[in-house]
């Protein structure tokens, strides 16, 4: 897992700081994101800030470790969490929290006289705004940093009814990577209808 992190994962990770000098970054819809709370000392006073690290969607969700007659699937987020200090040298890490947001993807098309000519342009414009749509759901692992949660709730004006604490793997759809694995194809597993 060390070499996989160093050669494959690490080059794809980009920390995005939010503090007095850096604006709030645009976090992508449905991507797993780490909120890393760090602490520095400024004039003798501790200063906390949050940095976001999104897990690129082109990475496989599980890293496979082959041991004799079995395969161990390690969630990619656990490898990143294990090595997150590599991104934050000489800084105290207070907490590392995984979360995922869902943005509002609804849009309506306006009717016009020349619908055919405008249709493609209007779809392109609407899809661009969709990336910046309002956050309507926040899924977070248990025991998140209250400092980070306060920032996220204020930034997205999201109430507790739309914040979901997940006590297991975030985004269970990722389990299809295991179900569809070549070792299990002929074992009699059936996808639900």
Regions found by a protein language model. Give the residues of each.
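N-terminal localization/anchoring segments of enzymes in phospholipid and broader phosphate metabolism
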Residues: 1-193
